A protein has these predicted regions:
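A generic local structural motif
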Residues: 24-27, 71, 131-133, 137, ...
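Acidic carboxylate-rich catalytic motifs and surrounding loops in phosphoryl-/glycosyl-chemistry enzymes
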Residues: 85-90, 130-134, 233-238
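Beta-strand-turn-beta hairpins that frame and shape the catalytic cleft
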Residues: 1-8, 137-144, 227
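Active-site-proximal loop/helix segment associated with metal-binding centers of metalloenzymes
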Residues: 102-144, 148, 175, 193-201
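Conserved beta-sheet core of the metallophosphoesterase superfamily
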Residues: 143-233
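Flexible, charged surface loops at secondary-structure boundaries
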Residues: 1-3, 30-36, 78-80, 138-140, ...
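Core catalytic region of metal-dependent phosphoesterases/phosphodiesterases
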Residues: 6-122
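A short C-terminal boundary segment appended to hydrolase-like catalytic domains
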Residues: 224-256
């Protein structure tokens, strides 16, 4: 079998809103799939920062401490040790809060930003990209990866058509649903929505969104061959279990 570059894209654990069962599945799959030899991409929203959702609010949510969120988010980096981190819209709240409010708030948010980025680097993240539709794109061979910059039922198709290269793929998070779609575009391509690693029942805003009915626990795994071809697939929860295969094999017909 030719050398394969294996990767895992996992996103949307949301700090102290993380689902411990989903994280346990991710860690176990990573060991089965190749451990430290796998390129691990944290796809964003590893922290929730819900108290910054409306800037610096005065409601109950706005009064919540960030400490538990920071602790749980950092534990994810300690345990999974991703090579790449794509900031999500929830991490971007730190930047947004610096654009409004007091100097004290700006300094605090900058301090938190510096701290979580430094912690990610300490845990092995060589690449950290901002939440930015142009600058926040990570490319591994023919596979593009982003946190997510579209909403709604067609979000995966729209982003796939926008980011996937000729014959390649796009993987995104953000929308929390699981999806694998063949793109109708010149040269073909695929787009994947990676699901999430958080607890839907504890995220209060999900109760008012029909789209939350599509949420699913999971992530995306795949590999790239020495010749530049790729394969990617969803790893996700089925009922109360997670099911995956451990072995990967490539086959070339003798006629070639």
């Amino acid at each position: 079998m030719s050398k394969l570059t294996k990767f895992i894209y996992a996103s949307d654990s949301h700090g102290d809103m993380a689902d411990p069962e989903a994280l346990a599945a991710l860690y176990e799959f990573t060991k089965d799939f190749g451990g430290s030899s796998v390129i691990k991409i944290a796809g964003g929203d590893q922290y929730d920062f819900r108290s910054l959702r409306k800037g610096v609010g005065t409601d109950k949510e706005g009064a919540e401490s960030l400490q538990a969120d920071l602790d749980e988010g950092k534990q994810f980096f300690d345990r999974w040790r991703p090579n790449v981190w794509l900031w999500g819209n929830h991490e971007h709240r730190l930047d947004a809060a610096q654009g409004a409010g007091s100097a004290l708030v700006r300094d605090y948010c900058q301090g938190v930003k510096d701290h979580i980025n430094a912690h990610a680097r300490k845990c092995g993240a060589k690449t950290i990209l901002p939440y930015h539709a142009d600058k926040g794109v990570y490319r591994l061979g023919p596979v593009a990866m982003v946190h997510g910059y579209a909403h709604g039922a067609n979000a995966t198709v729209l982003q796939g058509l926008h980011y996937a290269p000729y014959g390649g793929a796009l993987i995104h998070g953000h929308t929390h649903n699981l999806a694998s779609i063949a793109l109708t575009k010149h040269g073909g391509g695929n787009a994947f929505s990676a699901g999430c690693l958080c607890r839907k029942e504890d995220m209060t805003y999900s109760a008012q969104r029909l789209a939350s009915a599509r949420w699913g626990s999971g992530f995306v795994a795949g590999f790239i061959t020495a010749g530049g071809d790729y394969k990617a697939w969803l790893v996700h929860k089925m009922g109360d279990q997670w099911i995956w295969t451990k072995d990967v094999k490539t086959f070339t017909p003798r006629s070639r």
